[in-house]
Amino acid sequence: MKKLIAVISISALFLTGCGSSDASTVNQGASEFAQTVTDPSVVILDVRTPGEFSSGHLANAINIDVEGMQFNSEVSKLDKTKTYAVYCRSGRRSVIATDEMQKLGFTKLFNLEGGTGAWSAAGQTLVTN
């Protein structure tokens, strides 16, 4: 019995130590992300280039290019207590952006899996204003 308890205790300790470091980013498909961005308290962050942004973006999105020289300084100006819905064209850059945002202290992050490609394929619209 003591052996069993020891094995369970060690296993629990090991599994706890293997928790995801990405716990504060929730990856969502287009339909889930569409629900998330309807909440007016959520900040929608487009991390594509300004040119990509101007060709079509989610309504009410702000644009900070993750590959731009000023990404960290611009993101650092944002309120870390708010919830952010982050997207790009394919989902690759938004993962990079949410990783950087976590390092800066952001904890409430949602990532659009598949980016605007998945968004459009799901019948969701982009705006150009």
Region locations from a protein language model:
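Rhodanese-like catalytic fold shared by cysteine-dependent sulfurtransferases
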Residues: 2-7, 13-42, 51-83, 92-129
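Short cysteine clusters
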Residues: 88
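Structural scaffold elements adjacent to functional motifs in cytosolic proteins
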Residues: 44-46
